[in-house]
């Protein structure tokens, strides 16, 4: 989920407020859904009717944790509530039903709460758009064949699912827990059915990546390339995607005069060459995306199992050849043994084979790159790092999933982007130490935090990375700028930054 400063639910509305249709029903995941239509200033909270304008404290029940947390749900000041409503975690599940006309609502349901929010008949009012966003596959397992999809099927709600969430559901189908596997399969079938019936929205806007959400929503309303940009302004002949080594591909692009901009993706070494040569060639625009060294931060009370599963998925998928792969753990010493144990238990499930099945790990793309990996592993051993498992397979271009417990961040394997299925473990004592060592990295592309608590919030505000993923992995959106800082790149693609990069305005 997002850091606290950027928590998703945003209401774009006119400032003219009035009491609107109150129809909010709050129910646990094991309860039957009922649709309430209330004409007064009340709503159902915990299956009881309450007046929204009387200050009252409610008990927030979490079915997965079987505990109660007390919080203020509604109070008198809601009359003057600003058009920015937050609904994120169990500590922020504020129930509201003060609605204004001419606005769109985006509700984000935290994967930690295990709680469903069912809104009855809101579309029957003047509300134009109600979208419920589920941020991870886990709650969808619970919702897949039950309440929320029934509301989508009968047209009560416009239900949105992010493309990445659908991908995570597919990943959950590999779970060893039969109940999770079956529920994920049902969820995928149901989503496809609703999609083909135009009852579910494929949501490109991603609310999990820390960024300025207001800009993303504003960009959603802007013109689209396909329908509004005239071909004479951006002709196809001026857009090319050459791939290859620096001397044969990148450098000729710089000297090609008709090109107005060069968007580079590749190594930091060649990126430096491109950035030096570009100004010499008719002052071309250049954006550089040159990889990173991203870490997964795991602290006290964090979800170690989730962190291990998603880190292995992010690193071992594509043999680690992904720029935002979370190629290392930064762990509190209290979680170190559990991290190591969980990784060693799960590693054998990643099979090496040439097949293209989704649960198979294939070979390296380039042999020359593969040949550099054993040298880096041997270098780690020479620097007193412990290689706990993995390594190259003889007479092949395969590398078994490799786990290395690193003592210092001065090790070569910690300082360089290895671009391989290798996970390092760096142990720290405090959050401040994690921030200091994380920011010492020469890269600044992405970072991952496993929990939205105090540690997660502190890390999210202090780590010097462009992308911060909280309780999610490998999310991307056309609406959110993508790029890096430090040695991870210069400039950004996608979102508003793409409009700035690929257009020239008349002032």
Curated annotation (Swiss-Prot):
InterPro entries membership: Ald_DH/histidinol_DH, Ald_DH_C, Ald_DH_CS_CYS, Ald_DH_CS_GLU, Ald_DH_N, Aldehyde_DH_dom
Its EC number(s): 1.2.1.3
Boundaries of the annotated transit peptide in chain numbering: 1-21
Example GO biological process: ethanol catabolic process
Keyword Oxidoreductase among record annotations: yes
Residues where NAD(+) binds: 266-271
Localization terms from the record: Mitochondrion matrix
Residues at the catalytic site: 289, 323
UniProt cross-references to SUPFAM superfamilies, sorted A to Z: ALDH-like (SSF53720)
Primary localisation category: mitochondrion
One term of GO molecular function: aldehyde dehydrogenase (NAD+) activity
Keyword Mitochondrion included in the entry's annotation: yes
Family: Belongs to the aldehyde dehydrogenase family.
Subunit annotation: Homotetramer.
Identification of the protein by name: Aldehyde dehydrogenase 1, mitochondrial
Gene: ALD1
């Amino acid at each position: 989920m997002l850091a606290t400063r950027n928590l998703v639910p945003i209401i774009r509305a006119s400032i003219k407020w009035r009491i609107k249709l109150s129809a909010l029903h709050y129910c646990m995941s094991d309860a039957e859904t009922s649709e309430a239509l209330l004409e007064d200033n009340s709503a159902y909270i915990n299956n009881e009717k309450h007046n929204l304008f009387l200050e009252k404290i409610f008990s927030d029940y979490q079915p997965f944790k079987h505990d109660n947390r007390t919080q203020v749900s509604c109070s008198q000041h809601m009359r003057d509530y600003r058009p920015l409503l937050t609904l994120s975690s169990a500590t922020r599940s504020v129930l509201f039903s003060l609605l204004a006309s001419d606005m769109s609502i985006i509700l984000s349901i935290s994967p930690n709460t295990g709680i469903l929010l069912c809104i009855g008949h809101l579309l029957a009012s003047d509300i134009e758009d109600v979208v419920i966003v589920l941020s991870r596959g886990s709650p969808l397992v619970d919702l897949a064949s039950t309440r929320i999809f029934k509301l989508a099927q009968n047209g009560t709600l416009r239900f949105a699912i992010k493309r990445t969430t659908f991908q995570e559901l597919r990943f959950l189908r590999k779970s060893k827990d039969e109940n999770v596997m079956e529920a994920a399969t049902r969820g995928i079938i149901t989503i496809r059915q609703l999609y083909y019936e135009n009852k579910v929205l494929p949501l490109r806007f991603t609310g999990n990546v820390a960024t300025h959400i207001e800009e993303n929503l504003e960009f959603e309303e802007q013109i689209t390339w396909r329908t509004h940009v005239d071909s004479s302004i951006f002709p196809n002949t001026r857009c090319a995607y050459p791939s290859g080594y620096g001397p044969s591909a990148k450098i000729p692009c710089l000297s090609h005069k008709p090109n107005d901009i060069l968007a580079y993706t590749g190594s930091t070494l060649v990126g430096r060459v491109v950035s030096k040569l570009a100004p010499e060639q008719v002052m071309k625009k250049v954006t550089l995306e040159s990889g990173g060294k991203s870490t997964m931060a795991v602290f006290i009370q964090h979800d170690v199992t989730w962190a291990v599963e998603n880190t292995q998925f992010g690193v071992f998928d594509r043999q680690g050849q992904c720029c935002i792969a979370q190629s290392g753990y930064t762990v509190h010493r209290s979680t170190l043994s559990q991290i190591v144990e969980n990784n060693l238990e799960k590693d054998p499930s990643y099979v090496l084979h040439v097949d293209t099945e989704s649960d198979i790990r294939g070979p390296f793309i380039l042999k020359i790159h593969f040949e550099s990996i054993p040298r880096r592993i041997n270098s780690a051993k020479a620097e007193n790092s412990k290689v706990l498992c993995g390594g190259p397979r003889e007479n092949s271009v395969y590398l078994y999933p490799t786990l290395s417990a690193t003592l210092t961040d001065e090790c070569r394997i910690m300082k360089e982007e290895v671009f391989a299925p290798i996970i390092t473990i760096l142990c720290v004592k405090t959050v401040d130490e994690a921030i200091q060592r994380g920011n010492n990295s020469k890269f600044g592309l992405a970072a991952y935090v496993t929990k939205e608590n105090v540690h997660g919030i502190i890390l999210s505000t202090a780590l010097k990375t462009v992308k911060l993923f909280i309780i999610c992995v490998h999310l991307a959106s056309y609406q959110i700028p993508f790029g890096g800082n430090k040695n991870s790149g210069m400039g950004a693609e996608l979102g508003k930054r793409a409009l700035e990069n690929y257009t020239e305005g008349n002032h």
